[in-house]
Amino acid sequence: MSPRINELLADLPESEYQILYPHLELVSLSKGQDLFQLGEVPSHVYYPAGAVVSVMKDMEDGFSVETYMLGKSSLVGHCAFMGPSYYRANVRSSGLAYKMPFATLRQLVPLCPGHTQAVMQSLGRMIAQLSQTIVCGKHHSVEKQSMRWMLIT
């Protein structure tokens, strides 16, 4: 399977893809697996290639809320650029992903402006979707909310 199944990698200029490719490792992610915890700086970033990863916010009372899902159009672990994670990344649906050490990606960023732009666009989509989720939760029925989640994944 080619790493280009991940849309973020698929859209890169060939020159940037060739810079990143040698550092990608295909891994199998298991449902329920935590990729990193709240407050940790992720050691790796993941480019999902079938797996779906939930962004989880754990509450002090032990309750967890899924705030976002990341799939083949995303990068998991982008929060490492900002420091410790503000969420827990939990595998919601088993599948494959390509991983890369974050330290490696950080070194390669100056050589890959297209990748940086793609990550920023992905973050913009995430913010837009989170805003829509808030509106949906206040305005739509549970059935309509369920349909939105199915369309996302």
Language-model region placement:
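Cyclic nucleotide-binding regulatory module and flanking cytosolic helices
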Residues: M1-K31, S74-V76, A80-M82, L111
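Residues that recognize and position ribonucleotide moieties
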Residues: A10, V27, Y46, Y68, ...
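Nucleotide phosphate-binding site architecture
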Residues: Q18, F36, V76, Y98, ...
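Residues that scaffold the ATP/ADP-binding catalytic core of kinase and kinase-like folds
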Residues: L20, M56, H78-C79, Q107-L108, ...
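Small beta-barrel nucleic-acid-binding modules, principally OB-folds
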Residues: E25-L29, L35-L38, T153
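Cyclic nucleotide-binding regulatory domains
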Residues: D34-S93
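Polybasic "coupling" helices that flank or enter modular domains
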Residues: S93, P110-T153
